[in-house]
Amino acid sequence: MMSIPVNPTNASIQPQSLYDAWADLAWRAMLTEVNLSPKPGLVDRLNCGAHKDMALEDFHRSAEAIRDWLPRFMEYGASCTRLPPESVLAGLRPLGMACEAAMFRATAGVNTHKGSIFSLGLLCAAIGRLYQLRQPITAQTLCATSAAFCRGLTARELRQNNLQLTAGQRLYQQLGLTGARGEAEAGYPLVIRHALPHYRALLAQGRDPELALLDTLLLLMSLNGDTNVASRGGSDGLRWLQQHASFLLRQGGIRTPDDLVYLHQFNQQCIERNLSPGGSADLLIVTWFLAQISQVNH
């Protein structure tokens, strides 16, 4: 395992102003998602959704704590370009765990952004690697590089037959859900093939950015085998949420402010069923982040 770089050692390896710009986009992605309202079952500006243990302010504090760690993921990605990509993840883990600890300190123990630390950590490390190798930094190359980092991850961590199964292992064995690991190892297909093109198309049509993002969240909810939902509601809860999101999309989705009433109703139903599509929220963060990548001129 390579050591984690602490201080810049070479200006060509540590383009700090660029790293800070990309990190700022990732931080803004987390804030954009949590402030987006109304979201079914999720914490937003209006209520706490199906969560009784967290509030909007927890997410704001969490995002701020994570923000300082994001450039370090990039630094590590840039520092280990001689490693094969599948060997990078082992060196990222200590950074991810330290970032998680900072999140838990900021939220007094509430898990607000653990999934985003995983996905944004991978993407930020991919940025560092691609920048150092002078390769294009696009949504496609970032997702492909993240997939290379995670090669074999699902088999290693979900297919084990431990005496004490983790929540992820249990959902994999019972329902075949691979969660955040599987999505990352596959190169974020729900984002690259579905959510990102959908979001970009709505913006190109002149749609309101917030309404476009809410509609994109519905699309993710309709397609994603969300382990957050399945852990709360089982296969029946997941099927219901996917089908209801699909129904709203077939009815036209979220195109005007008048359509927000359907999201308010959906939110109330999620609260009653104790369902929270946190995995889809994490993928929405990835979607928004990748949609903004071209803003950084490198």
From Swiss-Prot:
Documented EC number(s): 2.4.2.52
Catalyzed reactions: 3'-dephospho-CoA + ATP = 2'-(5''-triphospho-alpha-D-ribosyl)-3'-dephospho-CoA + adenine
Keywords: ATP-binding, Nucleotide-binding, Transferase
Biological-process GO terms, alphabetical: prosthetic group biosynthetic process
Pfam families: CitG
InterPro entries: CitG, TriPribosyl-deP-CoA_syn_CitG
Family: Belongs to the CitG/MdcB family.
NCBIfam families, per database record: citrate_citG, PRK10096.1
Name this polypeptide is given: Probable 2-(5''-triphosphoribosyl)-3'-dephosphocoenzyme-A synthase
Organism: Salmonella arizonae (strain ATCC BAA-731 / CDC346-86 / RSK2980)
